[in-house]
Amino acid sequence: DEELLEYSKELNLVNLNPLYIKNYISEINNIYESFGYNDVDISYSENIYPDTNTADLSFVIIEGKITKINKIIFIGNDNIADENLQSIIKSKTKTLKNIFANNNFKKFVVENDVRLLNKYYVNNGYLDTNIEVNIEYLKTNKVNITFNIEEGKIYQFSLIDYLDSKNILNNNINNEIKKIIEIFLDRKNNDYSVEEINKLKDDISNILVENGIDYFEIQALEKIDNQNVNIRYNILPIEPKYTRQINIYGNSRTYDYVIRRELLVSEGDAIYESQLDEIKNKLRSLNIFENIKIVENDLGNNLVDLDITVKEKQTGSVSAGLSIGSIDGLAAVAGLKENNFYGTGRSVEALINTSDNKQQYTLKTTDRLFYENDVDVSYQINYVEQDFSKASSYNLDTFTVGTGISYKLYPKINHSLDIDYNIKDYQITNQSKASTNIKNSSGQNVSFVLSNNLFYSTLGYGFLPRDGNLVSYSNVIETPTSSSNGYVKNIITLKNFNKVNKNIYSIQTKIGNIISLNNNDILTDDKFSLGGRWLRGFDSFGAGPRDSRSSYIGGNNLIVTKLDFSRNIFDNSEFPVLLNVFNDYGLLWENKTKPTNSDNSLRSSVGFGIRYYSPIGPIGLTWGFPLMDEDYDIKRMFLFSVGNIDWLN
């Protein structure tokens, strides 16, 4: 009530002028709409006092319920998938796979979504994109939001050069800059991108700094000719400015040090303009601020005050999802996450992941390793119960306590290093069927595990990547202990997706090897298996070495490749349906003790499927037919999944 009275004063509601009253009601409606209340009913009554020439105004406000988003529709996006655009905008719909999504409708959020979409299109080379939004109000107090998109033509980088009019560069610097520009233009994809312009600008800046040039600015100038864009980097010397004071505003919850550790400067340091964008990007990457503004206040004599104003955002989230499928059965996921725990910038996450054959409980926290660095340190407790009774005649409970560091090695390459303390408890479910090494390990086994991981990805968003590459490498070392033989395990995963017109071609390969450090048998759960998602037409643990149907052994070496062709069979569909045709190949071999059934032979399958991104989540149906198999393999020619995105790729 107090806030509404304040608005009446601001709007000068001091008499019974009908226009003033109408304006006041209109403004109150706008305020309610900004909070998602679009079904507000406002009426008023007058009580006039002739003796004093005054009156009382009584407003009756029926707020109603918050308006919800029913559907989000994209029209005209012929070259960028709905899922990619959906991942960019803040407006969300509620589905079975994200039942805790905030689907409140707010006009200003939709207006910001248009800005985000335009920015995304420009960054992907579409400089002429025009986006209009239409809101359909339903009688159920829900809305359908339609984004009408005219993508326009895609622009390409044509010529990139630089200008050194003040001759501050030497021959060595010139050669280095020319080399990185040449590498940039030799790329396969030269679509215009603001991010790529800034990245190349940063690379040039790094060359200058590494060669002892500290005070400069680089202006990125653009010249457009038809659909070709020429870029010129103008390199100029500047007089250094020194930071007298750094002021931080708006962080009512977040501690100052969380912001200061992301800054590239301290009081007394020289500062130049390119640093301001980098500081803003580093603060934005924390994912705890809605808006960031940095202003230089010039004090004269080459001194400046740096004013950083942030607007904090909600950093806590609840997630939940359900899925059902042939491989995992009924699965449920629930989690809590806070990205700014008590204003420290630390993230805390609790996750429960259960399925028919697996229950997993995880508690994890992540923070910066040291002040003024980009390395994150994490601590994790994990407990997993796995049921291998049908495949290998044992159950396995694993308790893990671990810590690790992670950081960006390059803009799209992440590196992580983890060390874990594992307690494994093997429980034999069938003594006559379980393998000898599993029976010998029955009970608790203790080990230390060191993991080293590299990850590179240019894949787009969505339940099915359209374009891009993924390369990952994992090296795992288990130290020998009194209850563990120890091993070295290496896994390389390669994925390539290419979109040609409406067709999507992909090839995915996984290569693995594990070696015992004591020349002993590797435990079954540490070996590689073949079947299921990576070899369709075969059951999980369906192909490869085994003693019996319920005693799968696995192998020390793995090579598997998936070839896929997908095509959207309905144009302009809000929920895309894709036809998929595939051909899989897999080979699993080598064990110290030869299993009863093991011939080291190649397995292969072909098949087709339907992938449907439905209102309740992704749905996949697959029919696989083995071409090359063995009599002892376990086939599964039909697979389905509802709600599991990972299963589709």
Predicted regions and their residues:
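Solvent-exposed loop/turn segments connecting transmembrane beta-strands
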Residues: 299-300, 323-331, 350-361, 388-396, ...
